[in-house]
């Protein structure tokens, strides 16, 4: 779970003290007595790279949305002005999210239009407003208290280099300390006055601290690297965990069906199948007549497939395709740049952060044909205005007892009884106790 500090400046002071103590304390009290000058210079090079990458991770802006940024084909999207924004500077979508892009090459592909009232600008996909940095961050991963900065598209390479150099430096120091500990053990029968007591005390103090830093940073580095290889940020990993836990929730699928009806007006909800089957082709009849929009949207949200249940029976979370996973190699290059730039202090990512590339798998095999996340960003107003009218509150309060009794799998029953099954996106907490606010996301602006 993300650390919340009472005085944020401590998030930078504490790492600086630890880096200074480990690097220069170990060099002065221990290493200078045992390493050659060349080895000492190599060690100090590692320390210097730690400082450089740390400073860059702190001072590099994680990615600010361009002031003139506008979503593609925004002019063709139904947008209404708020009452006090008649000059057009504060455009908001008619709903909380609205269809913005349709890519003719791959069929109906779209993304949510989001407008940040605090930044007075549109939000690109994957961006979020940080409540601490007070800006919208491109491809926001999380707000890091130890850099007093967000980790986003532009400074993710610096952050990963910072972690990498710490692992390399503390790993090198750990090897030298282990050698000295073995040497002390082998000569433990010698008189005590022959040992350098200051050096011995330094080894006893520095070794556990160095191991703790090495192990904790290694775990964080591996976690971040796995996320990068998946093409996902920590926020998107959290989003996936939320969808996975709520996959059998009627509330989730009412939202998905409502969003589908809102974005693909006049088209019935598709028949969803597992990846082992072929999705049935559905003939879509375009309906240009707006009519009574609210009534039509409610009907599309609930009555597209009257013969089927709200929750698809042959469609699992494994059949859901994340739109920005381009494959391990492309994900690494987009996030960190080409390999020759990975160790360069000023290496930059290939992606610009506000025009994310869509994977071919998503274009070809996605069945829901909805933006990410499929149940939408803001859900409170939709639930109040639509879902409760269609019996969501009854489903939530009176769970189907016969269905629960028929479940024999303990893990499945435990998941179905999880109180997080029907909570809103803003209230969801994953197994590590993390919510959106723990990543620094401003929920009021998201």
Swiss-Prot record:
Membrane side Lumenal: residue ranges: 30-40, 183-201
Subcellular location: Endoplasmic reticulum membrane
All ranges on the Cytoplasmic side of the membrane: 1-8, 62-161, 223-446
Catalytic activity: L-cysteinyl-[protein] + hexadecanoyl-CoA = S-hexadecanoyl-L-cysteinyl-[protein] + CoA
Keyword annotations of the record: Acyltransferase, Endoplasmic reticulum, Lipoprotein, Membrane, Palmitate, Transferase, Transmembrane, Transmembrane helix
GO CC annotations, alphabetized: endoplasmic reticulum; endoplasmic reticulum membrane; Golgi apparatus
Stretches that traverse the bilayer: 9-29, 41-61, 162-182, 202-222
Active site: 144 (s-palmitoyl cysteine intermediate)
Keyword Electron transport part of the UniProt annotation: no
Top-tier EC class: transferase
Domain DHHC: 114-164
Function: Mediates the reversible addition of palmitate to target proteins, thereby regulating their membrane association and biological function.
Designated name of the protein: Palmitoyltransferase PFA4
Organism of provenance: Candida albicans (strain SC5314 / ATCC MYA-2876)
